[in-house]
Amino acid sequence: FLYQESYGSAQIRGNEELQNGYNYNFDLRYERFGKDGDMLSVTGYFKYLDSPIERIQALQGGATLHSFRNADNGMAAGVEVEFRKQLIKDLRLGANLSYMYTNVKLPEGGAYTNKERPLQGASPILANADLTYSPRFGEERQLNLALLYNLQGSRIHAVGVSNLGDIKQQTLHTLNFSAGYDLNKHFSLKLQVNDLLNRNVIFKQEVPSTGTEVEVERYKKGTDFEIGFSYKL
């Protein structure tokens, strides 16, 4: 059956011939902890991917149709750096940066346009940062304010088959804000604002015959607000 995504114009079809994918990973981590919750960690990792499931594209009556297919195998290797630091009393900065290299081996005689490429859905660069202010007022009352930034590098959104180029989601920046206030040990208030920047989500498709890319779709998810009130027994 077909279903329509909440965002974007593609229709999605399942694949009853899919097999489970498996991954086997090794990682090595160094961590250092300081006072006031300060922390630094560096992680290196390697993953072997057996029959990874990837999103692919096809054409059906001129409409955009996406489905899923197993690749033969693949690998992912990268490094991740994370730190937390108290700047002044009640004000804390945290950040995370990762770089990842991926490669996929495709089935012999398959219809994939690019015979060697990165793993679908994997961004080579990911970054997150947050600035948090959390003062206390007495024993029970506390204010929590946080500004959160995310960077997601360009990644393959749907794999090209039958001479169709790969569709790539372009680099995306997002900024969120959250606020919370504990009135006492029972009552608390919360405000969440997602995607303050409301940037366009842009997709471009490779044109194999010319080696260029053309924009095929863009949309905005919009900025949304959540207000909550909670009670703890």
Give, region by region, the residue ranges found by the protein language model.
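A short, compositionally biased micro-patch
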Residues: 21, 33-35, 74, 86, ...
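Conserved C-terminal beta-signal and adjacent last beta-strands/turns
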Residues: 21, 25-26, 118-233
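Surface-exposed extracellular loop regions of Gram-negative outer-membrane beta-barrel proteins
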Residues: 1-26, 36, 44-69, 148-162, ...
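Glycine-rich loops and low-complexity Gly/Arg-rich segments
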Residues: 9-14, 54-55, 65-69, 93, ...
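Gram-negative outer-membrane beta-barrel transporters
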Residues: 45-48, 67-158
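Membrane-embedded beta-strand positions in outer-membrane beta-barrel channels/transporters
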Residues: 15, 25-31, 39-41, 68, ...
